[in-house]
């Protein structure tokens, strides 16, 4: 029960339509991995400052930048449609804005999969106090 409560607290602080993005990540990576990317490095989780610490953290930086370019809908709350095809995701639906959110999430999930070998536990729960450098532009 305590683990469930901790996960609920962590889920509240993550940007995006968390449930969809989390399910997409788990599907693309082939296992339950969402918890590993909460508060990883300087960009995975809520917000982001400093320099990405590795390729995994850069996936989150690019995801944050992608969300920043979305206009006309809210990437933090709006739902979108997608289908699963052979370990990959195909974004669908008629709403171009929601499709853009889906593409941001799809690219990030694929980036995590492609860079899973760079994941380093020393960056999990890393903390913003370790990310004080100037942020690079998107």
UniProtKB/Swiss-Prot annotation:
Q: Which cysteines are joined by disulfide bonds?
A: 42-131, 44-60, 59-111, 65-138, 66-104, 73-97, 91-102
Q: Where does the chain bind Ca(2+)? A: 43, 45, 47, 64
Query: Which residues lie in coiled coils?
Result: none
Q: Record's SUPFAM superfamilies?
A: Phospholipase A2, PLA2
- What GO molecular function annotations does the UniProt record carry, in alphabetical order? calcium ion binding; calcium-dependent phospholipase A2 activity; phospholipid binding; toxin activity
Cofactor details (free text): Binds 1 Ca(2+) ion.
What residues form the membrane-spanning segments?
A: none
The enzyme class is: hydrolase
- Which tissues does it occur in? Expressed by the venom gland.
Instruction: Identify the GO cellular component terms for this protein.
Output: extracellular region
Reaction(s) catalysed (UniProt annotation): a 1,2-diacyl-sn-glycero-3-phosphocholine + H2O = a 1-acyl-sn-glycero-3-phosphocholine + a fatty acid + H(+)
Entry keyword Transcription: no
Q: Which Pfam families match?
A: Phospholip_A2_1 (PF00068)
EC identifiers of the protein: 3.1.1.4
Cofactor dependence = Ca(2+)
- Kindly list the places in or outside the cell where this protein is found, as annotated in its UniProt entry: Secreted
Q: Where mainly found?
A: secreted
Quote the catalytic residue positions.
63, 105
Quote the SMART domains the UniProt record gives: PA2c
UniProt protein name:
Acidic phospholipase A2 BITP01A
